[in-house]
Amino acid sequence: MIRLLGQSEYGLYALIGSLIAYFSVLDLGLGNAIVRYTSRNRAVGDKQIEAKLNGMFLILYLIIGILTIFIGAIIYFYLDDIFTNGLSTSELRKAKIMVIIITINFAFSFPLAIFGSIIQAYERFVIFKLVEIVRILAVPIITLPFLYLGFGSVAMVVIVSVVNIGSLLFNLYYCFKYIKIKFHFGKIDLTLLKEILGYSFFVFLGVIVDQIYWNTDQFILGALVGTVSVAIYAIAMQFINMYKRKQYEE
Protein backbone atom coordinates (compact mmCIF):
# COMPACT_ATOMS: atom_id res chain seq x y z
CA MET A 1 0.00 0.00 0.00
CA ILE A 2 2.83 2.41 0.89
CA ARG A 3 4.67 1.50 -2.32
CA LEU A 4 1.59 2.25 -4.41
CA LEU A 5 0.60 5.44 -2.59
CA GLY A 6 4.01 6.90 -1.84
CA GLN A 7 5.18 8.28 1.49
CA SER A 8 3.43 11.64 1.19
CA GLU A 9 0.05 10.22 0.19
CA TYR A 10 0.18 7.46 2.80
CA GLY A 11 1.24 9.98 5.43
CA LEU A 12 -1.76 12.15 4.57
CA TYR A 13 -4.06 9.13 4.89
CA ALA A 14 -2.55 8.21 8.28
CA LEU A 15 -2.71 11.82 9.47
CA ILE A 16 -6.40 12.28 8.68
CA GLY A 17 -7.08 8.84 10.14
CA SER A 18 -5.48 9.84 13.45
CA LEU A 19 -7.36 13.15 13.48
CA ILE A 20 -10.74 11.63 12.73
CA ALA A 21 -10.11 8.78 15.21
CA TYR A 22 -11.13 11.28 17.86
CA PHE A 23 -14.68 10.98 16.53
CA SER A 24 -14.83 7.55 18.16
CA VAL A 25 -14.69 9.32 21.52
CA LEU A 26 -18.21 10.62 20.80
CA ASP A 27 -19.54 7.10 21.29
CA LEU A 28 -19.37 7.97 25.01
CA GLY A 29 -19.12 4.29 25.87
CA LEU A 30 -22.75 3.74 24.85
CA GLY A 31 -21.88 0.68 22.75
CA ASN A 32 -20.87 -1.23 25.88
CA ALA A 33 -23.92 0.10 27.71
CA ILE A 34 -26.25 -1.24 25.00
CA VAL A 35 -24.77 -4.73 25.32
CA ARG A 36 -24.96 -4.66 29.13
CA TYR A 37 -28.49 -3.30 29.54
CA THR A 38 -30.01 -5.22 26.63
CA SER A 39 -28.51 -8.47 27.96
CA ARG A 40 -29.82 -7.69 31.43
CA ASN A 41 -33.30 -7.01 30.08
CA ARG A 42 -33.26 -10.23 28.04
CA ALA A 43 -32.96 -12.14 31.30
CA VAL A 44 -36.15 -10.42 32.46
CA GLY A 45 -37.86 -10.99 29.12
CA ASP A 46 -39.78 -7.70 28.96
CA LYS A 47 -39.98 -6.80 25.26
CA GLN A 48 -41.66 -3.47 25.95
CA ILE A 49 -38.81 -2.27 28.15
CA GLU A 50 -36.35 -3.51 25.54
CA ALA A 51 -38.13 -1.49 22.83
CA LYS A 52 -37.93 1.61 25.05
CA LEU A 53 -34.22 0.97 25.61
CA ASN A 54 -33.65 0.65 21.87
CA GLY A 55 -35.54 3.88 21.24
CA MET A 56 -33.59 5.77 23.88
CA PHE A 57 -30.22 4.55 22.61
CA LEU A 58 -31.15 5.39 19.02
CA ILE A 59 -32.15 8.93 20.03
CA LEU A 60 -28.83 9.36 21.86
CA TYR A 61 -26.90 8.14 18.83
CA LEU A 62 -28.87 10.40 16.48
CA ILE A 63 -27.89 13.36 18.67
CA ILE A 64 -24.26 12.20 18.56
CA GLY A 65 -24.51 11.88 14.75
CA ILE A 66 -25.70 15.49 14.46
CA LEU A 67 -22.94 16.60 16.85
CA THR A 68 -20.44 14.77 14.63
CA ILE A 69 -21.47 16.91 11.65
CA PHE A 70 -20.88 20.11 13.62
CA ILE A 71 -17.46 18.94 14.84
CA GLY A 72 -16.52 17.80 11.33
CA ALA A 73 -17.48 21.23 9.98
CA ILE A 74 -15.27 22.94 12.59
CA ILE A 75 -12.33 20.68 11.69
CA TYR A 76 -12.91 21.39 7.98
CA PHE A 77 -12.89 25.18 8.37
CA TYR A 78 -9.85 25.23 10.68
CA LEU A 79 -7.81 22.65 8.77
CA ASP A 80 -5.79 25.34 6.96
CA ASP A 81 -4.83 27.00 10.24
CA ILE A 82 -3.92 23.72 11.95
CA PHE A 83 -1.76 22.27 9.16
CA THR A 84 -0.52 25.40 7.39
CA ASN A 85 3.11 24.57 8.28
CA GLY A 86 2.97 20.83 7.65
CA LEU A 87 0.86 20.33 4.51
CA SER A 88 1.12 21.67 0.98
CA THR A 89 -1.81 23.33 -0.80
CA SER A 90 -2.70 20.15 -2.72
CA GLU A 91 -2.46 18.06 0.46
CA LEU A 92 -4.75 20.47 2.31
CA ARG A 93 -7.28 20.23 -0.52
CA LYS A 94 -7.26 16.43 -0.34
CA ALA A 95 -7.39 16.53 3.46
CA LYS A 96 -10.55 18.63 3.36
CA ILE A 97 -12.24 16.18 0.99
CA MET A 98 -11.27 13.30 3.28
CA VAL A 99 -12.62 15.11 6.35
CA ILE A 100 -15.99 15.59 4.59
CA ILE A 101 -16.19 11.91 3.63
CA ILE A 102 -15.22 10.61 7.06
CA THR A 103 -17.56 13.05 8.82
CA ILE A 104 -20.46 11.71 6.74
CA ASN A 105 -19.27 8.17 7.50
CA PHE A 106 -19.34 8.75 11.26
CA ALA A 107 -22.60 10.71 11.16
CA PHE A 108 -24.30 7.62 9.70
CA SER A 109 -22.22 5.09 11.62
CA PHE A 110 -23.20 6.26 15.10
CA PRO A 111 -26.98 5.67 14.73
CA LEU A 112 -26.32 2.39 12.89
CA ALA A 113 -23.84 1.19 15.55
CA ILE A 114 -26.71 0.28 17.88
CA PHE A 115 -27.54 -2.76 15.75
CA GLY A 116 -24.09 -4.31 16.11
CA SER A 117 -24.33 -3.93 19.88
CA ILE A 118 -27.78 -5.54 19.88
CA ILE A 119 -26.41 -8.51 17.93
CA GLN A 120 -23.73 -8.94 20.61
CA ALA A 121 -26.32 -8.61 23.38
CA TYR A 122 -28.29 -11.42 21.76
CA GLU A 123 -25.11 -13.51 21.72
CA ARG A 124 -25.06 -13.86 17.94
CA PHE A 125 -21.28 -13.74 18.11
CA VAL A 126 -20.66 -15.84 15.00
CA ILE A 127 -22.59 -13.51 12.70
CA PHE A 128 -21.11 -10.43 14.40
CA LYS A 129 -17.52 -11.66 13.98
CA LEU A 130 -18.24 -12.86 10.44
CA VAL A 131 -19.38 -9.37 9.44
CA GLU A 132 -16.24 -7.91 11.05
CA ILE A 133 -13.98 -10.35 9.18
CA VAL A 134 -15.69 -9.62 5.85
CA ARG A 135 -15.38 -5.88 6.48
CA ILE A 136 -11.67 -6.12 7.33
CA LEU A 137 -10.89 -8.30 4.29
CA ALA A 138 -13.06 -6.30 1.89
CA VAL A 139 -11.13 -3.05 2.38
CA PRO A 140 -7.71 -4.20 1.02
CA ILE A 141 -9.31 -6.46 -1.62
CA ILE A 142 -11.30 -3.54 -3.04
CA THR A 143 -8.61 -0.91 -2.43
CA LEU A 144 -5.65 -2.56 -4.17
CA PRO A 145 -7.14 -2.53 -7.72
CA PHE A 146 -7.97 1.17 -7.33
CA LEU A 147 -4.43 1.92 -6.16
CA TYR A 148 -2.99 0.10 -9.17
CA LEU A 149 -5.25 2.26 -11.36
CA GLY A 150 -3.65 5.37 -9.88
CA PHE A 151 -6.19 6.41 -7.27
CA GLY A 152 -4.90 7.78 -3.97
CA SER A 153 -5.76 8.40 -0.35
CA VAL A 154 -9.14 9.99 -1.08
CA ALA A 155 -10.28 6.83 -2.88
CA MET A 156 -9.10 4.76 0.10
CA VAL A 157 -11.22 6.84 2.48
CA VAL A 158 -14.25 6.45 0.19
CA ILE A 159 -13.81 2.66 0.06
CA VAL A 160 -13.36 2.35 3.83
CA SER A 161 -16.47 4.47 4.42
CA VAL A 162 -18.64 2.54 1.95
CA VAL A 163 -17.55 -0.84 3.32
CA ASN A 164 -18.10 0.33 6.90
CA ILE A 165 -21.61 1.66 6.26
CA GLY A 166 -22.42 -1.45 4.22
CA SER A 167 -21.50 -3.72 7.15
CA LEU A 168 -23.58 -1.61 9.53
CA LEU A 169 -26.57 -1.77 7.19
CA PHE A 170 -26.26 -5.55 7.18
CA ASN A 171 -26.40 -5.50 10.99
CA LEU A 172 -29.57 -3.40 10.73
CA TYR A 173 -31.11 -5.91 8.30
CA TYR A 174 -30.15 -8.85 10.51
CA CYS A 175 -31.65 -7.26 13.63
CA PHE A 176 -35.01 -6.60 12.00
CA LYS A 177 -35.13 -9.84 9.99
CA TYR A 178 -33.93 -12.41 12.51
CA ILE A 179 -33.91 -10.84 15.99
CA LYS A 180 -37.19 -8.98 15.36
CA ILE A 181 -36.20 -5.92 17.37
CA LYS A 182 -38.64 -3.08 17.99
CA PHE A 183 -38.29 0.59 18.91
CA HIS A 184 -40.48 2.67 21.17
CA PHE A 185 -39.98 6.44 21.23
CA GLY A 186 -41.77 7.61 24.34
CA LYS A 187 -40.82 9.53 27.43
CA ILE A 188 -37.20 8.86 28.40
CA ASP A 189 -36.66 7.30 31.82
CA LEU A 190 -34.27 9.88 33.30
CA THR A 191 -33.31 7.62 36.21
CA LEU A 192 -32.30 4.84 33.83
CA LEU A 193 -30.54 7.33 31.55
CA LYS A 194 -28.50 8.63 34.48
CA GLU A 195 -27.56 5.06 35.43
CA ILE A 196 -26.51 4.26 31.86
CA LEU A 197 -24.43 7.42 31.51
CA GLY A 198 -22.78 6.71 34.85
CA TYR A 199 -21.82 3.23 33.62
CA SER A 200 -20.61 4.40 30.20
CA PHE A 201 -18.59 7.32 31.62
CA PHE A 202 -15.69 5.11 32.71
CA VAL A 203 -15.61 3.37 29.33
CA PHE A 204 -15.65 6.83 27.73
CA LEU A 205 -12.76 7.94 29.96
CA GLY A 206 -10.68 4.95 28.89
CA VAL A 207 -11.30 5.73 25.20
CA ILE A 208 -10.21 9.36 25.67
CA VAL A 209 -6.95 8.33 27.35
CA ASP A 210 -6.31 5.75 24.62
CA GLN A 211 -6.90 8.27 21.82
CA ILE A 212 -4.67 10.92 23.39
CA TYR A 213 -1.88 8.39 23.98
CA TRP A 214 -1.89 6.72 20.55
CA ASN A 215 -3.09 9.40 18.07
CA THR A 216 -1.89 12.80 19.27
CA ASP A 217 1.71 12.28 18.14
CA GLN A 218 0.77 11.79 14.46
CA PHE A 219 -1.39 14.90 14.65
CA ILE A 220 1.52 16.96 16.02
CA LEU A 221 3.92 15.61 13.38
CA GLY A 222 1.49 16.50 10.60
CA ALA A 223 0.95 20.01 11.92
CA LEU A 224 4.64 20.82 12.43
CA VAL A 225 6.70 18.61 10.11
CA GLY A 226 4.76 17.05 7.22
CA THR A 227 3.17 13.93 5.76
CA VAL A 228 6.42 12.06 5.03
CA SER A 229 7.32 12.07 8.74
CA VAL A 230 3.78 10.93 9.56
CA ALA A 231 4.14 8.03 7.10
CA ILE A 232 7.40 6.84 8.68
CA TYR A 233 5.94 7.15 12.17
CA ALA A 234 2.73 5.35 11.12
CA ILE A 235 4.76 2.42 9.79
CA ALA A 236 6.61 2.15 13.10
CA MET A 237 3.27 2.24 14.92
CA GLN A 238 2.11 -0.74 12.86
CA PHE A 239 4.90 -2.84 14.40
CA ILE A 240 3.96 -1.62 17.89
CA ASN A 241 0.32 -2.56 17.29
CA MET A 242 1.38 -6.02 16.08
CA TYR A 243 3.38 -6.48 19.29
CA LYS A 244 0.40 -5.34 21.38
CA ARG A 245 -1.93 -7.82 19.66
CA LYS A 246 0.62 -10.58 20.26
CA GLN A 247 0.68 -9.71 23.97
CA TYR A 248 -3.14 -9.84 24.19
CA GLU A 249 -3.17 -13.25 22.50
CA GLU A 250 -0.73 -14.59 25.07
Language model region names:
Residues 1-21, 153-158, 191-203, 216, ...:
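Interfacial/gating helices of multi-pass transporter permease domains
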Residues 160, 171-215, 229:
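Interhelical loop/hinge segments that connect adjacent transmembrane helices in multipass membrane
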Residues 5-13, 45-55, 66-103, 148-158, ...:
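Membrane-interface helix-capping segments at transmembrane helix termini in multi-pass transporters
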Residues 6, 23-63, 82-85, 115, ...:
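Transmembrane-helix boundary and interhelical linker motifs in polytopic inner-membrane proteins
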Residues 74-77, 87-112, 129, 141, ...:
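Alpha-helical transmembrane segments of multi-pass membrane proteins
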Residues 14-42, 61-68, 104-112, 167-170, ...:
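Small-residue-rich midsections of specific transmembrane alpha-helices
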Residues 106-134, 154:
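Membrane-interface junctions at transmembrane-helix termini in multi-pass inner-membrane proteins
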Residues 2-9, 126, 137-169, 231:
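Membrane-interface helix-loop junctions in multi-pass transport and translocation proteins
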